[in-house]
C-alpha cells in the first residue's frame, strides 16, 4: 500500500485472494497478475487459482509456461489412502537421492480421509536445483494406481506431449477400450502419450508379495522412466 502510490499505481493492490478451497497457485496465475498490472484498466480486486463465478473477479490465464529447470522429470502418482503409493514414492526419492547425482523433490497431497481417500504424489528429479513450490501440472510421467479413477479425474490432461501414462488395472485390451473415457483416449492419441498397463496385484501375488502392489508399481516406474538402472 505504501509502494503502489509512489509508483503512480493508486490502489491497484487493494485486495487480492488466492489459494481458496486449497487450490494451488501456479506460475500461470502469477503471470496473470503482471498482465493485469499492465492493463489499461487493471482490476483492483481479483481472485487467483479458482474460477470465481460468485464475484467474477478471476484473472484470465492466457499462458501456462513450464518453469522447471531444463532436464527436470516431473511425475504424478494417483493412489488410494493406505495402498502404499505414498510410502513407495517417499522411498523412490530416497533411492534416487542416494544412488544418483540428481536433485529430488516430493510433495504429497491427501484428502480428508486417512484411509481409503485419494492421494497424489508429486515427484521431480533433475540435474539442476529444483525450487518449484507448487504442485505438478505438466508431467512427463503419470501413474494411476487405482483404475476407478479413470472416470473420476482428468489425469492424462497433465501429461506433456510425448509423455507416459501407466495404469494399474486387471482389464484385457478389449475391456480397456470399453472402460477408458473417450476424452482420455482422445488426449492420449492426439498427444502421442506412451500408454502402459500393468496388473500390479496379480504380479505381487505371483512373486510372493501379496498386498504389496505398490512395490511392483514402483519397479514399473523405475523401468519405464529410466531414471536409474533396474
Place the predicted regions along the sequence by residue.
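Single conserved hydrophobic/aromatic residue that forms the stacking wall/gate
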Residues: 2-13
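Alpha-helix C-terminal capping/helix-to-coil transition sites in glycosyltransferase folds
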Residues: 8, 137-139, 161
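Short alpha-helices
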Residues: 14-36, 179-230
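Flexible inter-domain linker/hinge segments
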Residues: 19-74
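Anionic-ligand anchoring segments at beta-strand to alpha-helix junctions in alpha/beta enzyme folds, i.e.
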Residues: 71-142
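Short glycine/serine/threonine-rich phosphate/pyrophosphate-binding segments
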Residues: 85-91, 150-154, 213-215
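ADP-ribose/adenylate-binding Rossmann-like module
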Residues: 157-187, 195
